[in-house]
């Protein structure tokens, strides 16, 4: 499932599509050492 992210609302389907994303499409900051770009919570880039 893609989720809108970024200020232009592009669809985020995979890592670095428009922001850092988990495989499931959750946008997240790149602070997870084990799964870079993944997080348990949503994150909208500015």
Curated annotation (Swiss-Prot):
Keywords: D-amino acid, Disulfide bond, Ion channel impairing toxin, Neurotoxin, Secreted, Toxin, Voltage-gated sodium channel impairing toxin. Expressed by the venom duct. One of its GO terms (cellular component) is extracellular region. GO terms for molecular function: sodium channel regulator activity; toxin activity. It is found in: Secreted. Its main location: secreted. InterPro entries: Conotoxin-I_CS, Toxin_19. The modification D-methionine is found at residue 44. It comes from the Eukaryota. Residues 46 form a propeptide. Disulfide bonds join 5-19, 12-22, 18-27, 21-38. Iota-conotoxins bind to voltage-gated sodium channels (Nav) and act as agonists by shifting the voltage-dependence of activation to more hyperpolarized levels. Produces general excitatory symptoms. Belongs to the conotoxin I1 superfamily. The cysteine framework is XI (C-C-CC-CC-C-C). This is Iota-conotoxin-like R11.2. It comes from Conus radiatus (Rayed cone).
């Amino acid at each position: 499932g893609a989720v809108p992210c970024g200020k232009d609302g592009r669809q985020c389907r995979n890592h670095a599509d428009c922001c850092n994303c988990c495989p499931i499409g959750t946008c997240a900051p790149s602070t997870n050492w084990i799964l870079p770009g993944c997080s348990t919570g949503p994150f909208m880039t500015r």
